[in-house]
């Protein structure tokens, strides 16, 4: 994509975001939205890595006698590895995978993924994160990834942006996306961060990307705030 086309894309996207935000303010009678934190997914948002994940999942499941088409892997974006494995196992075999099977399958998939071409960071992602941080909004990561080198990889590609106590990974959650648990965990980590810095954490409005109506309601209920589904 040329720089000119990228600028046009950003302008169009910014116009859409402003219109959606204005409509939300009118609907709820608010004067403005004061963002305190922004939660970013990693694969497909910060890194252009979904094609590698899709290929690795497809080949891994075939190796273990199950079928997961590459296109379907995109539908499981954000899930924990165990969550994806159990969905396929239930469909293909009629039962969930054992803990030992999950460990073996995920290790095989991780090995294939690590052999794929290096996934570059998304165009303009670093510039966006710098702008977010400069505006006083706290950038966070909420990902289903269980990579042990996650923080090092983020710091190498996005220096001086993220910190470990403001990250939610597969190691922090039981259910994973699309369950609201990772976002709720992110809100709790943000509140703990604010308290550590000597501040107070007020109720939040959650802007949820691509979540279902029921997930939106769950986020709003458990957070004590509101949830604006972002589609």
Predicted feature locations:
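Acidic, Mg2+-coordinating phosphoryl-transfer loop and its flanking beta/alpha structural elements
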Residues: 201-231
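Short, acidic loop-to-helix structural element flanking the phosphoryl-transfer center
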Residues: 24-34, 114-141, 148
């Amino acid at each position: 994509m040329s720089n000119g086309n990228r600028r046009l894309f950003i302008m169009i996207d910014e116009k859409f975001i402003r219109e959606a935000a204005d409509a939300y303010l009118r609907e709820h009678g608010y004067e403005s939205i004061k963002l305190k934190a922004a939660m970013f997914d990693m694969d497909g948002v910060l890194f252009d890595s979904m094609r590698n994940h899709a290929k690795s999942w497809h080949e891994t499941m075939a190796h273990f006698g199950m079928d997961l088409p590459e296109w379907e892997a995109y539908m499981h974006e954000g899930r924990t590895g165990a969550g994806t494995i159990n969905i396929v196992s239930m469909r293909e075999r009629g039962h969930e995978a054992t803990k030992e099977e999950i460990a073996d399958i995920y290790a095989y998939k991780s090995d294939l993924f690590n052999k794929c071409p290096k996934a570059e960071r998304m165009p303009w992602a670093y510039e966006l994160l710098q702008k977010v941080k400069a505006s006083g909004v706290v950038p966070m990561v909420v990902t289903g990834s269980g990579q042990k080198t996650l923080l090092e990889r983020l710091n190498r590609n996005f220096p001086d942006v993220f910190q470990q106590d403001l990250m939610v990974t597969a190691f922090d959650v039981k259910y994973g996306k699309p369950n609201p648990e990772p976002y709720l965990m992110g809100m709790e980590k943000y509140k703990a961060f604010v308290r550590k810095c000597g501040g107070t954490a007020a109720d939040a409005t959650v802007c949820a990307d691509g979540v279902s109506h029921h997930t939106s309601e769950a986020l709003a209920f458990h957070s004590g705030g509101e949830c604006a589904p972002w589609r």
